[in-house]
Protein backbone atom coordinates (compact mmCIF):
# COMPACT_ATOMS: atom_id res chain seq x y z
CA UNK A 1 0.00 0.00 0.00
CA UNK A 2 1.54 3.25 -1.05
CA UNK A 3 0.31 6.75 -0.47
CA UNK A 4 -1.27 8.01 -3.70
CA UNK A 5 -4.91 8.81 -4.31
CA UNK A 6 -7.29 11.64 -5.14
CA UNK A 7 -10.56 12.23 -3.35
CA UNK A 8 -12.12 14.31 -6.15
CA UNK A 9 -11.16 11.90 -8.90
CA UNK A 10 -12.65 8.99 -6.94
CA UNK A 11 -15.93 10.80 -6.26
CA UNK A 12 -16.29 12.06 -9.82
CA UNK A 13 -15.70 8.82 -11.68
CA UNK A 14 -16.08 5.79 -9.40
CA UNK A 15 -16.81 3.41 -12.30
CA UNK A 16 -13.96 4.49 -14.53
CA UNK A 17 -11.63 4.36 -11.53
CA UNK A 18 -12.01 0.59 -11.52
CA UNK A 19 -10.22 0.43 -14.88
CA UNK A 20 -7.32 2.64 -13.94
CA UNK A 21 -3.92 1.26 -13.02
CA UNK A 22 -4.75 1.53 -9.32
CA UNK A 23 -8.20 0.01 -9.84
CA UNK A 24 -6.78 -3.00 -11.65
CA UNK A 25 -4.14 -3.48 -8.94
CA UNK A 26 -6.83 -3.42 -6.25
CA UNK A 27 -8.96 -5.92 -8.17
CA UNK A 28 -6.00 -8.28 -8.59
CA UNK A 29 -5.24 -8.10 -4.86
CA UNK A 30 -8.87 -8.87 -4.00
CA UNK A 31 -8.99 -11.84 -6.37
CA UNK A 32 -5.67 -13.23 -5.14
CA UNK A 33 -6.78 -12.97 -1.51
CA UNK A 34 -10.10 -14.64 -2.21
CA UNK A 35 -8.74 -17.46 -4.34
CA UNK A 36 -5.91 -18.42 -2.00
CA UNK A 37 -8.27 -18.55 1.00
CA UNK A 38 -11.01 -20.49 -0.79
CA UNK A 39 -8.37 -22.73 -2.41
CA UNK A 40 -8.76 -24.69 -5.63
CA UNK A 41 -10.62 -27.47 -3.86
CA UNK A 42 -13.29 -25.87 -1.65
CA UNK A 43 -15.82 -28.01 0.21
CA UNK A 44 -13.45 -30.99 0.17
CA UNK A 45 -12.36 -32.33 3.57
CA UNK A 46 -9.33 -34.00 1.97
CA UNK A 47 -8.18 -30.78 0.32
CA UNK A 48 -5.61 -29.95 2.96
CA UNK A 49 -3.69 -33.10 2.25
CA UNK A 50 -3.97 -32.73 -1.51
CA UNK A 51 -2.51 -29.22 -1.41
CA UNK A 52 0.97 -30.62 -1.17
CA UNK A 53 0.44 -33.59 -3.43
CA UNK A 54 2.78 -33.28 -6.37
CA UNK A 55 0.45 -35.39 -8.51
CA UNK A 56 -2.56 -33.10 -8.06
CA UNK A 57 -2.69 -31.24 -11.37
CA UNK A 58 -5.41 -28.85 -10.16
CA UNK A 59 -3.25 -27.55 -7.34
CA UNK A 60 -0.12 -27.56 -9.46
CA UNK A 61 -1.71 -25.38 -12.13
CA UNK A 62 -3.67 -23.28 -9.66
CA UNK A 63 -0.84 -22.38 -7.32
CA UNK A 64 1.60 -22.06 -10.19
CA UNK A 65 -0.76 -19.50 -11.72
CA UNK A 66 -1.07 -17.65 -8.41
CA UNK A 67 2.70 -17.41 -8.20
CA UNK A 68 3.02 -16.18 -11.78
CA UNK A 69 0.26 -13.59 -11.36
CA UNK A 70 1.81 -12.40 -8.12
CA UNK A 71 5.24 -11.90 -9.68
CA UNK A 72 3.75 -10.11 -12.70
CA UNK A 73 1.60 -7.88 -10.50
CA UNK A 74 4.52 -6.91 -8.28
CA UNK A 75 6.56 -5.95 -11.33
CA UNK A 76 3.74 -4.13 -13.12
CA UNK A 77 1.74 -2.41 -10.37
CA UNK A 78 3.59 -2.33 -7.04
CA UNK A 79 5.90 0.37 -5.75
CA UNK A 80 9.40 -1.19 -5.81
CA UNK A 81 10.19 0.42 -2.45
CA UNK A 82 7.20 -1.31 -0.88
CA UNK A 83 8.22 -4.66 -2.33
CA UNK A 84 11.80 -4.32 -1.10
CA UNK A 85 10.65 -3.39 2.39
CA UNK A 86 8.48 -6.45 2.94
CA UNK A 87 11.22 -9.04 3.38
CA UNK A 88 13.38 -8.20 6.37
CA UNK A 89 16.74 -9.87 7.10
CA UNK A 90 15.10 -12.04 9.75
CA UNK A 91 12.54 -13.28 7.23
CA UNK A 92 15.28 -14.06 4.71
CA UNK A 93 17.11 -16.05 7.40
CA UNK A 94 13.88 -17.85 8.31
CA UNK A 95 13.36 -18.81 4.67
CA UNK A 96 16.98 -19.99 4.50
CA UNK A 97 16.23 -22.40 7.35
CA UNK A 98 13.18 -23.59 5.42
CA UNK A 99 15.34 -24.34 2.38
CA UNK A 100 17.90 -26.10 4.58
CA UNK A 101 15.17 -28.25 6.12
CA UNK A 102 14.07 -29.24 2.62
CA UNK A 103 17.62 -30.34 1.84
CA UNK A 104 17.70 -32.31 5.11
CA UNK A 105 14.34 -33.99 4.41
CA UNK A 106 14.10 -37.74 3.96
CA UNK A 107 12.52 -37.14 0.54
CA UNK A 108 13.86 -33.78 -0.74
CA UNK A 109 11.85 -33.75 -4.03
CA UNK A 110 8.56 -34.26 -2.19
CA UNK A 111 9.56 -31.75 0.48
CA UNK A 112 10.46 -29.24 -2.22
CA UNK A 113 7.04 -29.63 -3.83
CA UNK A 114 5.37 -29.01 -0.47
CA UNK A 115 7.66 -26.07 0.30
CA UNK A 116 6.85 -24.52 -3.08
CA UNK A 117 3.22 -24.18 -2.00
CA UNK A 118 4.41 -22.47 1.19
CA UNK A 119 6.62 -20.05 -0.75
CA UNK A 120 3.85 -19.25 -3.24
CA UNK A 121 1.51 -18.57 -0.32
CA UNK A 122 4.01 -16.14 1.24
CA UNK A 123 4.58 -14.46 -2.14
CA UNK A 124 0.85 -14.09 -2.70
CA UNK A 125 0.24 -12.50 0.70
CA UNK A 126 3.09 -10.06 0.09
CA UNK A 127 1.53 -9.16 -3.26
CA UNK A 128 -1.90 -8.60 -1.70
CA UNK A 129 -0.35 -6.07 0.68
CA UNK A 130 1.83 -4.35 -1.91
CA UNK A 131 -0.81 -3.70 -4.59
CA UNK A 132 -3.48 -1.51 -2.88
CA UNK A 133 -2.44 2.15 -3.13
CA UNK A 134 -4.07 3.45 0.04
CA UNK A 135 -6.33 2.54 2.95
CA UNK A 136 -9.49 2.88 0.88
CA UNK A 137 -8.21 0.43 -1.74
CA UNK A 138 -7.14 -1.96 0.99
CA UNK A 139 -10.62 -1.75 2.53
CA UNK A 140 -12.14 -2.75 -0.80
CA UNK A 141 -9.88 -5.80 -0.89
CA UNK A 142 -10.95 -6.76 2.63
CA UNK A 143 -14.65 -6.26 1.90
CA UNK A 144 -14.59 -8.28 -1.33
CA UNK A 145 -12.64 -11.17 0.19
CA UNK A 146 -14.72 -11.30 3.37
CA UNK A 147 -18.04 -11.22 1.52
CA UNK A 148 -17.06 -13.90 -1.00
CA UNK A 149 -15.39 -16.31 1.45
CA UNK A 150 -18.08 -15.98 4.12
CA UNK A 151 -20.83 -15.95 1.51
CA UNK A 152 -19.61 -19.22 0.00
CA UNK A 153 -19.27 -20.73 3.47
CA UNK A 154 -22.82 -19.80 4.46
CA UNK A 155 -24.28 -20.90 1.12
CA UNK A 156 -22.39 -24.18 1.46
CA UNK A 157 -24.27 -24.95 4.67
CA UNK A 158 -27.44 -25.17 2.56
CA UNK A 159 -26.19 -26.35 -0.82
CA UNK A 160 -23.37 -28.68 0.31
CA UNK A 161 -24.28 -29.59 3.91
CA UNK A 162 -22.22 -32.80 3.95
CA UNK A 163 -19.12 -30.86 2.88
CA UNK A 164 -19.66 -27.56 4.73
CA UNK A 165 -20.55 -29.33 7.99
CA UNK A 166 -18.77 -31.99 9.98
CA UNK A 167 -20.98 -35.09 9.92
CA UNK A 168 -21.09 -38.46 11.61
CA UNK A 169 -19.60 -39.88 8.41
CA UNK A 170 -16.54 -37.62 8.74
CA UNK A 171 -13.16 -38.84 9.96
CA UNK A 172 -13.99 -37.20 13.31
CA UNK A 173 -17.65 -38.03 13.99
CA UNK A 174 -17.44 -36.35 17.40
CA UNK A 175 -17.46 -33.01 15.54
CA UNK A 176 -20.77 -33.74 13.80
CA UNK A 177 -22.87 -30.62 13.31
CA UNK A 178 -19.99 -28.15 13.59
CA UNK A 179 -19.48 -25.71 10.73
CA UNK A 180 -16.41 -25.62 8.48
CA UNK A 181 -17.71 -23.84 5.34
CA UNK A 182 -15.38 -23.94 2.34
CA UNK A 183 -12.52 -25.08 4.57
CA UNK A 184 -11.30 -28.57 5.34
CA UNK A 185 -11.79 -28.48 9.11
CA UNK A 186 -13.46 -26.47 11.84
CA UNK A 187 -10.02 -25.69 13.28
CA UNK A 188 -9.25 -23.77 10.09
CA UNK A 189 -12.69 -22.21 9.62
CA UNK A 190 -12.79 -20.86 13.19
CA UNK A 191 -9.49 -18.91 13.08
CA UNK A 192 -10.21 -17.58 9.58
CA UNK A 193 -13.57 -16.24 10.73
CA UNK A 194 -11.83 -14.75 13.75
CA UNK A 195 -9.52 -12.83 11.43
CA UNK A 196 -12.51 -11.66 9.39
CA UNK A 197 -14.07 -10.36 12.61
CA UNK A 198 -10.93 -8.27 13.16
CA UNK A 199 -11.29 -7.00 9.59
CA UNK A 200 -14.89 -6.00 10.30
CA UNK A 201 -13.79 -4.10 13.39
CA UNK A 202 -11.11 -2.32 11.35
CA UNK A 203 -13.66 -1.25 8.74
CA UNK A 204 -16.05 -0.04 11.44
CA UNK A 205 -13.35 2.02 13.16
CA UNK A 206 -12.34 3.78 9.95
CA UNK A 207 -15.92 4.84 9.23
CA UNK A 208 -17.36 2.05 7.08
CA UNK A 209 -19.95 1.23 9.72
CA UNK A 210 -22.36 -0.92 7.73
CA UNK A 211 -19.72 -3.09 6.08
CA UNK A 212 -17.74 -3.35 9.30
CA UNK A 213 -20.65 -4.33 11.52
CA UNK A 214 -22.04 -6.80 8.97
CA UNK A 215 -18.71 -8.56 8.44
CA UNK A 216 -17.97 -8.63 12.17
CA UNK A 217 -21.34 -10.14 13.08
CA UNK A 218 -21.36 -12.68 10.22
CA UNK A 219 -17.83 -13.80 11.07
CA UNK A 220 -18.57 -14.12 14.79
CA UNK A 221 -21.74 -16.14 14.19
CA UNK A 222 -19.91 -18.57 11.91
CA UNK A 223 -16.93 -18.77 14.25
CA UNK A 224 -19.13 -19.65 17.23
CA UNK A 225 -20.72 -22.49 15.23
CA UNK A 226 -17.31 -24.06 14.55
CA UNK A 227 -17.28 -25.11 18.19
CA UNK A 228 -13.76 -23.85 18.82
CA UNK A 229 -13.63 -22.71 22.44
CA UNK A 230 -10.02 -21.59 22.09
CA UNK A 231 -10.85 -19.34 19.15
CA UNK A 232 -13.95 -17.97 20.86
CA UNK A 233 -11.84 -16.99 23.86
CA UNK A 234 -8.92 -15.56 21.91
CA UNK A 235 -10.99 -13.19 19.75
CA UNK A 236 -12.19 -10.83 22.51
CA UNK A 237 -8.85 -11.24 24.29
CA UNK A 238 -6.92 -10.12 21.19
CA UNK A 239 -9.27 -7.18 20.59
CA UNK A 240 -8.96 -5.94 24.17
CA UNK A 241 -5.17 -6.26 24.29
CA UNK A 242 -4.78 -4.25 21.08
CA UNK A 243 -7.56 -1.65 21.31
CA UNK A 244 -7.90 -0.92 25.02
CA UNK A 245 -4.38 0.49 25.69
CA UNK A 246 -4.79 2.95 22.82
CA UNK A 247 -8.17 4.11 24.08
CA UNK A 248 -6.72 5.03 27.47
CA UNK A 249 -3.62 6.69 26.01
CA UNK A 250 -1.18 3.87 26.76
CA UNK A 251 -0.31 2.51 23.33
CA UNK A 252 2.91 1.03 24.74
CA UNK A 253 0.69 -1.30 26.75
CA UNK A 254 -0.18 -3.36 23.68
CA UNK A 255 3.31 -4.80 23.00
CA UNK A 256 3.85 -5.29 26.73
CA UNK A 257 0.60 -7.22 27.08
CA UNK A 258 1.41 -9.12 23.86
CA UNK A 259 4.73 -10.27 25.30
CA UNK A 260 3.19 -11.19 28.65
CA UNK A 261 0.41 -13.16 26.93
CA UNK A 262 2.92 -15.11 24.83
CA UNK A 263 5.14 -15.89 27.84
CA UNK A 264 2.19 -16.93 30.00
CA UNK A 265 0.76 -19.14 27.26
CA UNK A 266 4.13 -20.76 26.61
CA UNK A 267 4.50 -21.59 30.30
CA UNK A 268 0.92 -22.86 30.55
CA UNK A 269 1.33 -25.17 27.54
CA UNK A 270 4.90 -26.28 26.83
CA UNK A 271 5.96 -25.33 30.35
CA UNK A 272 3.92 -28.11 31.98
CA UNK A 273 5.88 -30.59 29.86
CA UNK A 274 9.42 -29.21 29.75
CA UNK A 275 9.82 -27.04 32.87
CA UNK A 276 10.09 -29.27 35.99
CA UNK A 277 8.76 -26.69 38.50
CA UNK A 278 5.77 -25.90 36.29
CA UNK A 279 5.24 -29.59 35.57
CA UNK A 280 5.21 -30.30 39.31
CA UNK A 281 2.69 -27.53 40.02
CA UNK A 282 0.46 -28.69 37.17
CA UNK A 283 0.53 -32.28 38.43
CA UNK A 284 -0.30 -31.05 41.92
CA UNK A 285 -3.14 -28.64 41.17
CA UNK A 286 -4.29 -29.59 37.66
CA UNK A 287 -3.60 -33.33 37.30
CA UNK A 288 -6.02 -33.72 34.38
CA UNK A 289 -4.61 -30.81 32.35
CA UNK A 290 -3.49 -32.41 29.07
CA UNK A 291 -5.06 -30.10 26.45
CA UNK A 292 -7.04 -33.07 25.08
CA UNK A 293 -3.96 -35.27 24.96
CA UNK A 294 -1.62 -32.73 23.39
CA UNK A 295 0.89 -33.01 26.23
CA UNK A 296 1.53 -36.59 25.13
CA UNK A 297 2.51 -35.36 21.67
CA UNK A 298 4.73 -32.64 23.10
CA UNK A 299 6.55 -35.06 25.39
CA UNK A 300 7.22 -37.40 22.48
CA UNK A 301 8.30 -34.54 20.20
CA UNK A 302 10.66 -33.28 22.90
CA UNK A 303 12.24 -36.70 23.28
CA UNK A 304 12.77 -36.97 19.52
CA UNK A 305 14.07 -33.40 19.27
CA UNK A 306 16.75 -34.20 21.85
CA UNK A 307 18.21 -36.67 19.35
CA UNK A 308 18.57 -34.05 16.57
CA UNK A 309 18.45 -30.61 18.21
CA UNK A 310 20.50 -28.65 15.69
CA UNK A 311 18.98 -29.63 12.36
CA UNK A 312 15.70 -31.31 13.23
CA UNK A 313 14.33 -34.05 11.01
CA UNK A 314 13.69 -32.02 7.87
CA UNK A 315 10.65 -30.42 6.29
CA UNK A 316 7.67 -32.79 6.01
CA UNK A 317 9.88 -35.55 7.46
CA UNK A 318 8.51 -36.25 10.91
CA UNK A 319 4.76 -36.45 11.57
CA UNK A 320 2.97 -39.00 9.42
CA UNK A 321 6.19 -40.48 8.03
CA UNK A 322 7.61 -44.04 8.23
CA UNK A 323 9.82 -42.80 11.08
CA UNK A 324 6.72 -42.69 13.29
CA UNK A 325 4.59 -45.29 11.54
CA UNK A 326 7.11 -47.92 12.62
CA UNK A 327 7.05 -46.79 16.26
CA UNK A 328 5.43 -48.90 18.95
CA UNK A 329 2.29 -47.47 20.55
CA UNK A 330 2.28 -47.80 24.37
CA UNK A 331 -1.12 -48.79 25.71
CA UNK A 332 -1.26 -45.79 28.09
CA UNK A 333 -0.45 -43.10 25.50
CA UNK A 334 -3.42 -40.73 25.04
CA UNK A 335 -2.94 -40.32 21.27
CA UNK A 336 -1.50 -42.70 18.72
CA UNK A 337 1.43 -40.69 17.37
CA UNK A 338 1.51 -42.89 14.26
CA UNK A 339 -1.68 -41.27 12.93
CA UNK A 340 -0.93 -37.65 13.89
CA UNK A 341 -0.23 -35.20 11.05
CA UNK A 342 1.31 -32.45 13.22
CA UNK A 343 2.33 -31.80 16.81
CA UNK A 344 -0.45 -29.36 17.75
CA UNK A 345 2.15 -26.75 18.64
CA UNK A 346 3.65 -24.68 15.86
CA UNK A 347 6.73 -23.59 17.77
CA UNK A 348 7.67 -27.11 18.80
CA UNK A 349 7.08 -28.32 15.26
CA UNK A 350 9.51 -25.73 13.89
CA UNK A 351 12.17 -27.09 16.26
CA UNK A 352 11.40 -30.70 15.35
CA UNK A 353 11.48 -30.05 11.59
CA UNK A 354 14.18 -27.35 11.34
CA UNK A 355 16.13 -27.45 14.59
CA UNK A 356 16.42 -25.26 17.67
CA UNK A 357 18.42 -22.51 15.86
CA UNK A 358 15.51 -22.12 13.44
CA UNK A 359 13.13 -21.87 16.39
CA UNK A 360 15.20 -19.02 17.82
CA UNK A 361 14.99 -17.15 14.52
CA UNK A 362 11.26 -17.86 14.37
CA UNK A 363 10.72 -16.43 17.86
CA UNK A 364 12.35 -13.19 16.77
CA UNK A 365 10.66 -13.06 13.36
CA UNK A 366 7.18 -14.08 14.50
CA UNK A 367 7.01 -12.56 17.99
CA UNK A 368 9.60 -9.85 18.59
CA UNK A 369 9.84 -8.11 15.19
CA UNK A 370 6.06 -7.49 15.00
CA UNK A 371 6.20 -5.70 18.37
CA UNK A 372 9.03 -3.50 17.12
CA UNK A 373 7.07 -2.72 13.95
CA UNK A 374 3.94 -1.93 15.95
CA UNK A 375 5.78 0.64 18.06
CA UNK A 376 7.14 2.29 14.89
CA UNK A 377 3.71 2.87 13.35
CA UNK A 378 3.20 6.59 12.56
CA UNK A 379 0.62 8.16 14.85
CA UNK A 380 -1.86 8.84 12.06
CA UNK A 381 -5.43 7.61 12.22
CA UNK A 382 -5.28 5.30 9.19
CA UNK A 383 -1.94 3.83 10.24
CA UNK A 384 -3.17 3.21 13.78
CA UNK A 385 -6.40 1.51 12.67
CA UNK A 386 -4.64 -0.66 10.12
CA UNK A 387 -1.77 -1.44 12.48
CA UNK A 388 -4.24 -2.49 15.17
CA UNK A 389 -5.94 -4.83 12.68
CA UNK A 390 -2.67 -6.48 11.74
CA UNK A 391 -1.66 -6.74 15.40
CA UNK A 392 -4.94 -8.48 16.30
CA UNK A 393 -4.34 -11.02 13.54
CA UNK A 394 -0.71 -11.58 14.56
CA UNK A 395 -1.51 -11.89 18.28
CA UNK A 396 -4.43 -14.23 17.73
CA UNK A 397 -2.46 -16.53 15.41
CA UNK A 398 0.65 -16.47 17.61
CA UNK A 399 -1.38 -17.60 20.63
CA UNK A 400 -3.36 -20.13 18.61
CA UNK A 401 -0.07 -21.68 17.46
CA UNK A 402 0.53 -22.99 20.98
CA UNK A 403 -2.32 -25.47 20.45
CA UNK A 404 -2.30 -25.89 16.67
CA UNK A 405 0.46 -26.23 14.10
CA UNK A 406 0.31 -24.21 10.89
CA UNK A 407 3.70 -22.50 10.50
CA UNK A 408 5.05 -23.07 6.97
CA UNK A 409 2.17 -25.47 6.35
CA UNK A 410 1.80 -24.93 2.62
CA UNK A 411 -1.24 -22.72 1.89
CA UNK A 412 -2.99 -23.22 5.23
CA UNK A 413 -5.35 -20.20 5.54
CA UNK A 414 -4.41 -19.63 9.19
CA UNK A 415 -0.72 -19.53 8.26
CA UNK A 416 -1.52 -17.16 5.39
CA UNK A 417 -3.35 -14.78 7.72
CA UNK A 418 -0.40 -14.88 10.13
CA UNK A 419 1.97 -13.94 7.30
CA UNK A 420 -0.53 -11.26 6.30
CA UNK A 421 -0.45 -9.78 9.80
CA UNK A 422 3.35 -9.80 10.12
CA UNK A 423 4.02 -8.34 6.66
CA UNK A 424 1.22 -5.84 7.19
CA UNK A 425 2.71 -4.58 10.45
CA UNK A 426 6.07 -4.10 8.80
CA UNK A 427 4.57 -2.22 5.88
CA UNK A 428 2.27 0.08 7.86
CA UNK A 429 5.17 0.99 10.16
CA UNK A 430 7.32 2.28 7.31
CA UNK A 431 5.07 4.88 5.64
CA UNK A 432 2.01 7.03 6.36
CA UNK A 433 -1.25 5.87 4.82
CA UNK A 434 -3.13 8.16 2.47
CA UNK A 435 -6.82 8.88 3.06
CA UNK A 436 -9.59 9.06 0.48
CA UNK A 437 -13.31 9.43 0.79
CA UNK A 438 -15.11 6.50 2.40
CA UNK A 439 -17.51 4.51 0.28
Locations of regions flagged by a protein language model:
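Transmembrane signal-anchor hairpin modules in multi-pass inner-membrane enzymes, especially those
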Residues: 1-100, 130-140, 207, 427-439
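Alpha-helical transmembrane segments of multi-pass inner-membrane proteins
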Residues: 66-70, 98-99, 139-174, 181-247, ...
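Aromatic-anchored transmembrane helix interface
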Residues: 87-96, 108-130, 141-146, 192
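Hydrophobic transmembrane alpha-helices and their immediate junctions
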Residues: 130, 208-210, 244-247, 256, ...
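A membrane-periplasm/extracellular boundary helix in multi-pass inner-membrane enzymes
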Residues: 154-161, 225-226, 243-289, 302-307, ...
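Long extracytoplasmic/lumenal interhelical loops at the membrane interface
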Residues: 283-299, 307, 311-354, 373, ...
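Transmembrane alpha-helices of multi-pass inner-membrane enzymes
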Residues: 387-439
